Amino acid sequence: MSLAVVPCTDRAVWDGYVDRFQGHPQQLWGWGETKGMHGWSVDRVLVTDDENILGCAQLLVRKLPFPFRALVYVPRGPMCSAGDTTAVLAQLAGYASSRHHGVALSIEPDWDAESPFAPAVAAAGFRPSANTVLIPRTLILDLARSDDELMADMSKSTRANIRKAMRSEVDFRKVQTEAELEQVLGIYHETADRAGFGIHEDKYYRDIFANLGEGSPIIGAFDGEQLLAFVWLSRSGATAFELYGGVSAEGQKQRVNYGVKWAALLAMREDGCGRYDFNGLLNDGISDFKKQFAKHENLLMGTWEKPLSPLYPVYARAMPAARKGLQAARRLMKRVTRR
């Protein structure tokens, strides 16, 4: 069987393949468009045997300092069947090397750590990497379950807070206008300052809202026209994925963050998604809040890299230190700009 890698330049065709392969929303065209506006270049490719499409991947390419040239990264991809994984990855690695001169092909698949995909990834010459972008330890809910089944896995206090919020006069609905989006950004800044995490510039979030459209719903808790809390997601046909969330001081007092999370679950189920991914668990207060919504955790495969250059060992040692330095510089700049 002769395989080839073919670029895809049509948005509708591409997003159709994402849904066909039950792909992740970070593989959607609109997500790539946003990353392409903020430091990456984007290449969407299909792996074909001339008769059938065996797999596909949205490649994000980042230029690196000399002599490394480039990193090719696939967020929550590629997309293919378990039986085709090794062949698809081999084709993608060859393409990443010849077309983009990558020092490595880095993938963070939307596959369970103990799924049949795992040995196929290793067989394709990939190795685990500590250069993680998307956290593999997460919480994924099955939205095929009923309200009662979902709530049964929550803590008693969480159920009580949800029911109280849903009985209140707060209106839980999707954010629709640019003015409402600006309220979202205001609360996100407030939440980031309170919790001490870094965020992008506002234009990044406005671009997500514009480029993904219905593929990036924001569920808000409104008191009249005033936003109190939000959950911002991206979604494909199969999966809803939390991107961001925030709550105002007043929203905290009313505990509407419980209600808005529940409203987001129901909205994504109504939109036809079968999975709801809380997007990572750490050992922090935000993760403690997430863990109140289920009794289990999920572990995805994590980050795997295929070396494409003799310089890969140097890159693999240098990259973690470089990322830490960049993150420290961003935190410093943020503190300076607040003064």
Predicted regions located by residue number:
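Conserved beta-strand-loop-alpha-helix junction that forms the acyl-donor binding cleft
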Residues: I107-P116, F278-G285
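Glycine-/proline-rich flexible loop or hinge segments
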Residues: P67-C80, H100-S106
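Aromatic (often tryptophan-rich) hydrophobic motifs at membrane interfaces
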Residues: A87-S97, Y204-A316
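A conserved beta-strand-loop-helix scaffold within acyl/acetyltransferase catalytic domains
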Residues: L3-D50, C56-P67, P109-E114, P119-P136, ...
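Short, high-confidence coil segments that cap the C-terminus of an alpha-helix
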Residues: W40-V42, H100-G102, E270-C273
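Short histidine-centered catalytic/ligand-binding loop motif
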Residues: V72-G83, D193, V247-Q254
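Active-site/acyl-donor-binding loops of N-acyltransferases
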Residues: S2, P7-R11, T34, L60-V61, ...
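Short catalytic-loop micro-motif centered on adjacent basic/acidic residues
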Residues: A104-I107, R173, G274-F278
